Amino acid sequence: MPYLTSADNTKLYVKEWGAGPPVVLLHGWPLSSDSWDDQAMAIADAGYRAIAYDRRGFGRSDQPWSGYDYNTLADDLACVIEQTGAKDATLVGFSMGGGEVARYMSRHAGKSVVKAALISSVVPFMLKTPDNPEGTDASVFDEMTAGMKEDRAKFFAGFFKDFFGVSLLAHPTSVEQLEWARSVSMQAGLKGTLACAKSFATTDFRADLAAFNVPTLIIHGTDDKTVPINPAGRAAAKGIAGSTLIEYDGAPHGLFATHKARLTSDLLTFLGR
């Protein structure tokens, strides 16, 4: 079942590994489901069914002109859950994917979900506003948009250095990892890339947090420059009743690569509870 069809006839690429309780993995911007491969293999080996799909506009999925708002993206997730028969599923959302988890929990009342995990997630609200003073200033997102429109490949070359915490003194990932990430990001359509950036930058998920009525794990790096921890992971932990927050001291955004062994272990522990 490599492709499913969404409610608006968008084809979504889906891969399923293993058999057992379903774990649906939602990737971050601007990557694809392949970014979850290390964790998906371990999850499948541990006796679970790992389900990962490419968000519309990214990877091998269709690149429609519209549908990059979080309501539509949550509806896409609902189609994946329904058409794969993922009953009693755990949802794991990385970065932008955490927003889909949050909106699904409210918009679809958490149907078929028994656990949720938010990894380096944009939830609850990224944008700096009078009532969200620790958010990111709108000018930062405006600069991102301008950079992508001018030279997307060059923009991503710089973007992924912060994403993976690469600097003159720190090299938590290889040069090849950076090149891979940029190549995957360039597979996405420009329209979807820009529209999704606007969606994760401006969507307020604070009202969605009350819908998390299942055990919820939150993992975030304290040195995440892409999605800073204070208005994201720490704020989400305060807003989701009974959630568990694990902070990775000094860690950047791209934990699936920079801290893949620890992240995999923490996810498997959470799944086994």
Q: What does each model-found stretch correspond to?
A:
Residues 27-29, 89, 93-98:
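Conserved alpha/beta-hydrolase "nucleophile elbow" surrounding the catalytic nucleophile
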Residues 6-66:
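Conserved HGGG/HGGXW glycine-rich cap/lid loop of the alpha/beta-hydrolase fold
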Residues 124-136, 146-210:
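Conserved alpha/beta-hydrolase catalytic His-Asp/Glu region
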Residues 212, 218-220, 224:
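Short beta-strand/loop motif that positions the catalytic acidic residue
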Residues 225-231:
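Conserved alpha/beta-hydrolase "acid-adjacent" motif
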Residues 242-273:
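Catalytic active-site module of serine/aspartate enzymes centered on a nucleophile-bearing elbow/loop
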Residues 72-89:
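Conserved acidic catalytic loop of the alpha/beta-hydrolase fold
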Residues 102-150:
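Flexible "cap/lid" loop of the alpha/beta hydrolase fold
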